[in-house]
Design a protein with these regions (language model features):
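N-terminal accessory targeting/assembly segments
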Residues: 1-94, 102-103
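A generic structural signal for well-ordered coil/turn residues at beta-strand boundaries
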Residues: 5, 20, 91, 112-114, ...
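P-loop NTPase nucleotide-binding/switch module
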Residues: 74-76, 83, 90, 103-152, ...
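Mid-sequence acidic-hydrophobic segments that form the walls
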Residues: 98, 102, 121, 174, ...
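Active-site phosphate-binding and catalytic loops of NTP-dependent enzymes
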Residues: 33-35, 83-87, 102-108, 126-132, ...
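Short beta-alpha junctions and helix-cap segments that line functional grooves
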Residues: 21, 48-49, 63-64, 78-82, ...
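P-loop NTPase catalytic core
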Residues: 144-147, 151-440
Length: 440
């Protein structure tokens, strides 16, 4: 070890043996230093770090744990095998840390037969299938206005406290995917515990693999948790399963990347994010989608927007990468309607092809009414609009209570795709094949 600055370690003698992304083992030489390092790490496992830069000064490492007990006389060696993992379907029902160690008090998860690289390349574009059939998300507002097909990747964009985590809980409970892989990146420990025990519940956890990296973990582990989440999802997809991959949040993954690349010496650009952050985002997210076989990974990724500003650099990059965006609005949340979906600002790139022929006119009609009401909301609130001035606005005012009731949904309520469109058709006065006996 030559130098320790902040969280960055610089060592010599390995420049010809390691490359970027390799994992190294860091071994304190003295007994006292080893004991101190083990106490800081919380276990007696070897201390690991990843190579993030190489230059004439030596090999630059960022550690997977705290640096307590590490001195300049520490010995650094190449550690092989940490860039691959062997997931198994027997991981379903388990909560794991970024190194695939159990967090639920159970035994170590059994390894699968096939080995997967954590940083695998996405499938070649010419080998990918198109979107699969529509996925019933179990959330009425999303089924109606932002349809999601198997293999699609969508973002949930919102500021803090607008209901992203609650919406993820609903998706985890109510969607009809075969299996779920949930990545909690940079979350508070209390929220992780609440999601595992109250949010998912026993039924949701029984079909989920949960990967957790809390906010107090080093940036390298927060980054690794996101890659482990996608790797587990790929392994389940290769078993022919329709996997729903939920990551909360991509913004905190990007913040971890910012820490890593700034420590490695990259210059900051847009809002302090180095260029490599924007290069790495698609490398992670492109791994979701339809596979080359029967399985698929449908991805729903939350994006925390600063000050509810969708032009934030990470939010802007995510909209360009993903196949749709679900926007949650603070004003709607403050009015008490959850999920706080902003229908007019949300978009699914699988629409309108995802809709059946009888569904499309109903949804288009509803969107026209919602837009008409939004454009004249101020006049209506001031009492300046006179009924009869515009038939479309009159219809929008009359339909608003029914539309708001349809968009609202309790966390424990599960909607059914066919019934959702039938209810919307009845609310708007459309004839609908499956609307028999359905009332609002």
């Amino acid at each position: 070890m030559r130098r320790c600055r902040g969280t960055l370690l610089v060592c010599g003698g390995l420049s010809g043996l390691v490359g970027l992304g390799d994992t190294c083992r860091i071994e304190p030489r003295s007994h006292n230093q080893r004991e101190c390092a083990w106490r800081a790490a919380g276990d007696r496992e070897p201390l690991l770090g990843e190579v993030v830069a190489l230059d004439e000064a030596g090999v630059h490492l960022l550690p997977f744990s705290e640096l307590a007990g590490i001195g300049l006389d520490a010995r650094v060696t190449l550690a092989r095998g940490h860039d691959r993992i062997r997931p198994s379907t027997r991981w379903i029902g388990r909560a794991l840390d970024p190194l695939a160690r159990p967090l639920d008090g159970g035994p170590a998860p059994p390894w699968g037969a096939a080995s997967y690289p954590l940083h695998a390349r996405p499938a070649p574009a010419h080998q990918r299938r198109d979107f699969g059939p529509r996925l019933d998300l179990g959330v009425r507002a999303l089924n109606l206005f932002t349809p999601c097909c198997r293999g699609q990747r969508m973002g949930i964009f919102a500021g803090s406290g607008v209901g992203k985590s609650t919406l993820l809980t609903m998706l985890a409970r109510h969607s009809d995917a075969d299996a779920l892989v949930v990545g909690l990146i940079g979350e508070r420990g209390r929220e992780v515990n609440a999601l595992l025990h109250q949010g998912l519940g026993s039924a949701g956890l029984a079909r989920s693999v949960v990967v957790v990296a809390t906010s107090d973990m080093p940036a390298m582990l927060r980054r690794r948790a996101a890659y482990l989440t996608l790797t587990v999802a790929e392994a389940l997809r290769d078993q022919g399963l329709a996997v729903l991959c939920l990551i909360d949040s991509v913004t905190r993954f990007a913040m971890a990347l910012r820490e890593i690349y700034l420590a490695a010496g990259e210059p900051p650009t847009s809002k302090g994010y180095p260029p490599s952050v924007f290069a790495e985002l698609p490398r992670l997210l492109e791994r979701a989608g339809p596979g080359t076989g029967d399985g698929s990974i449908t991805g729903l990724f939350t994006v925390l927007v600063e000050g509810d500003d969708l032009s934030d650099p990470i939010a802007d990059a995510m909209r360009a990468i993903l196949d749709g965006h679900i926007v949650l609005d603070r004003r709607i949340a403050e009015d008490g309607r959850f999920p706080a979906l902003d229908v007019l600002r949300s978009l699914s790139r699988s629409a309108p092809a995802a809709y059946r022929p009888e569904e499309r006119p109903v949804v288009e009609h509803a969107r026209r009414l919602i837009r008409a009401h939004a454009e004249t909301a101020e006049l209506i609130q001031l009492g300046a609009y006179r009924r009869g001035s515009d038939p479309l606005i009159d219809e929008a005012i009359a339909a608003r209570p029914a539309l708001e009731a349809l968009l609202a949904q309790d966390v424990d309520e599960r909607s059914v795709l066919a019934d959702d469109f039938a209810h919307l058709a009845v609310a708007l006065g459309h004839a609908y094949p499956e609307a028999t006996g359905v009332g609002v």
